[in-house]
């Protein structure tokens, strides 16, 4: 995250009381005087020699400390950390506690800017242990623990700091972020995240940007050893970043990255880019380096011609040579440039601003307090005219820079949301880019012990709600080719044809009311209604359609009568209500309601009883809105014994399929099987006798 390090040069500067030339002159003068003393005072005691040696060491140590301060002021954090570490190790633990505390704090500041949160935490702990007086060390320790994901320890440290500084907004938001992270631990996420190994090296690789009609190109910055030149950065200890790119082949596979062609890359840092809508102009961040001045960054442009990029041209945001300007992001319509700056007029740290690319006069706009904080708000990505993604360490988050999504509700008013894990982590997460769908790439230094940034891919897995089912006939045999239609109150309409086994599957929306209708040639339609849950989790539903045959009688299960009576019992209501639904779903059907008895009793008695029972069913249907013209009651007594179907055979394996349960056959059975056969013969069923009712 080199450019974030550069753009933070002017925040929390460390003390530097002596210019470099003065420090070096003093050191040289002191060394000369020491030689004179040694030549003219050979007879003095060893005590004086030792005293002078100690003084010499102290003077050189002070010189090193001044060098480290100058390195830090120039943003050379890596070099400064090496120098501070040498000074720290030369200081005695007991006799020089204040000095060790001060140097430990400055060393921690280097590690903080190098994203080495573990080392930073250790350094700040040492500063506090050696009684460094500035409570800022406690705040920075809390932030380092926060970035390590040590939320419980970070909470305690934030609370200690807030006891001394109760109104510090960064500490308050940090404390809130830690508590929220603890509460959300283990909450499932719909995002999948994987390291983009093809784009990553053993150094830092960051800020990917997808481009192309099919998002088949990706540009990113890298400090790989393949970057231009041999110079190592004093800021990071790595090579300065160059811009690389990769393309997909005909199979849709990413190819090995290469440096962009042309004059764009130099020995200085280049990276964090965005493109004009036509793709011919690149806006990118470039380091500015002047002798004896802090490294800063500016926005440059380059144009493409024949796949090569032109020499960079500085894009002058405003006439300001003291502020930093970087992280450009062009709006999809090409009208605006979003960028990051520490210029005056912000809310502290780095702020996100916007300027018109069409009419620049009077169009400079700070995005306001919904986006910008007292911390650093960086890496804007404009996905649409009203949706902005950015990273911030000032809003409550999981640690370091966290990714946020913001929807515009006014010029400077936004509704923002913190993106969930695993998009965010306790480390720095930034530089997100999207393809057309909810997938893309971003940058994170999670799990890297050196704090190096790497590119990760992500994909949002939508909530999957399905309904599966089967269509059978009354004998539980599948009805292949049955047509199932489903209509939702969200306007969705779907149609499926049942497979050979009668099964089907639909994908549903969340919290939608549906009506389903199943039908097939030779069968009556059946309709069912249900509502899917508005759940954030995957869900599966199951439904069964049992289609009555038009050509064969359909038994109505669970119709009960009292012994020797025709009155319907209460247990029969559910089955009869299902029949009412079938008749309402098939309004042109006329049916015969038939009742059958077992072999017991005379034919005349059974004929009368069965007819009265059939009429009881018809009367119930009429009472519940079915026209009498669509119903016919018929009693058959014991004259039509049941023929064993596949379903009956599955329930009663002792009866072979196709067997007629006649009185003669039943009498040949055991007593137990006779009772089972009599139960099968006692039934109420209906048959379709017309399809022309109007």
Language-model-detected regions and their locations in the chain:
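Short, ordered, surface-exposed loop/turn motifs in non-cytosolic proteins
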Residues: 80, 349, 475-489
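Short, acidic Ser/Thr/Gly-rich low-complexity loop/linker segments typical of extracellular
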Residues: 489-503
């Amino acid at each position: 995250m080199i450019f974030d390090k550069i753009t933070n040069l002017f925040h929390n500067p460390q003390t530097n009381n002596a210019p470099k030339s003065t420090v070096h002159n003093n050191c040289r003068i002191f060394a000369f005087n020491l030689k004179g003393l040694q030549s003219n005072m050979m007879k003095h005691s060893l005590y004086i020699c030792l005293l002078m040696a100690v003084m010499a060491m102290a003077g050189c140590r002070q010189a090193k400390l001044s060098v480290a301060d100058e390195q830090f002021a120039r943003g050379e954090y890596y070099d400064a950390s090496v120098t501070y570490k040498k000074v720290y190790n030369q200081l005695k633990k007991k006799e020089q506690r204040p000095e060790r505390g001060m140097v430990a704090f400055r060393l921690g500041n280097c590690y903080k800017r190098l994203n080495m949160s573990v080392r930073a935490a250790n350094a700040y702990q040492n500063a506090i242990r050696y009684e460094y007086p500035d409570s800022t060390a406690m705040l920075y320790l809390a932030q380092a623990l926060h970035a390590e994901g040590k939320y419980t320890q970070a909470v305690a440290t934030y609370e200690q700091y807030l006891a001394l500084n109760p109104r510090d907004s960064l500490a308050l938001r940090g404390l809130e972020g830690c508590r929220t992270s603890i509460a959300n631990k283990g909450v499932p996420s719909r995002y999948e995240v994987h390291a983009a190994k093809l784009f990553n090296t053993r150094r830092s690789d960051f800020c990917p940007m997808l481009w192309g009609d099919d998002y088949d190109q990706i540009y990113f910055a890298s400090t790989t050893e393949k970057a231009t030149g041999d110079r190592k950065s004093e800021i990071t200890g790595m090579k300065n970043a160059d811009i690389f790119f990769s393309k997909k082949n005909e199979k849709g596979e990413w190819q090995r990255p290469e440096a962009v062609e042309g004059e764009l890359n130099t020995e200085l840092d280049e990276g964090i880019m965005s493109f004009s809508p036509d793709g011919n102009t690149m806006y990118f961040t470039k380091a500015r380096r002047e002798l004896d001045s802090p490294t800063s960054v500016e926005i440059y442009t380059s144009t493409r011609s024949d796949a090569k990029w032109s020499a960079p041209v500085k894009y002058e945001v405003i006439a300001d040579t003291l502020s930093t300007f970087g992280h450009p992001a062009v709006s999809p319509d090409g009208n605006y440039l979003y960028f990051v700056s520490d210029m005056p007029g912000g809310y502290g740290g780095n702020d996100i601003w916007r300027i018109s690319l069409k009419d620049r006069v009077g169009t400079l706009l700070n995005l306001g307090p919904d986006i910008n904080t007292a911390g650093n708000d960086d890496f804007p990505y404009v996905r649409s005219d009203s949706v902005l993604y950015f990273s911030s360490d000032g809003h409550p988050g999981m640690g370091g820079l966290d990714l946020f999504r913001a929807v515009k509700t006014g010029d400077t008013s936004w509704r923002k949301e913190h993106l969930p894990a695993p998009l965010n982590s306790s480390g720095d997460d930034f530089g997100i880019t999207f393809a057309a769908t909810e997938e893309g790439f971003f940058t994170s230094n999670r799990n890297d012990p050196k704090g190096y940034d790497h590119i990760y891919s992500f994909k949002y897995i939508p909530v999957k709600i399905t309904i599966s089912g089967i269509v059978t006939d009354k004998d539980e045999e599948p009805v292949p080719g049955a047509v199932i239609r489903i209509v939702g109150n969200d306007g969705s309409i779907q149609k499926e044809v049942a497979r050979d086994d009668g099964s089907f599957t639909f994908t549903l929306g969340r919290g939608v009311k549906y009506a389903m209708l199943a039908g097939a040639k030779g069968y009556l339609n059946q309709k069912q209604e249900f509502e899917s849950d508005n759940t954030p989790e995957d869900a599966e539903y199951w439904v069964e359609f049992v289609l009555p045959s038009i050509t064969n009688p359909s038994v109505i299960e669970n119709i009960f009568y009292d012994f020797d009576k025709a009155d319907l019992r209460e247990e029969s209501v559910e089955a009869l209500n299902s029949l009412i639904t079938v008749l309402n779903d098939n309004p042109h059907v006329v049916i015969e309601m038939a009742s059958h008895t077992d072999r017991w009793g005379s034919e005349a008695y059974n004929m009368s009883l069965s007819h009265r029972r059939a009429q009881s069913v018809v009367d119930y249907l009429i009472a519940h809105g079915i026209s009498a013209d669509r119903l016919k009651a018929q009693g058959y007594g014991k004259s039509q014994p049941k023929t064993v179907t596949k379903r009956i055979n599955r329930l009663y394996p002792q009866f072979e399929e196709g067997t007629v349960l006649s009185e003669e056959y039943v009498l040949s059975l055991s007593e137990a099987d006779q009772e089972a056969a009599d139960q099968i013969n006692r039934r109420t069923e209906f048959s379709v006798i017309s399809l022309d009712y109007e």
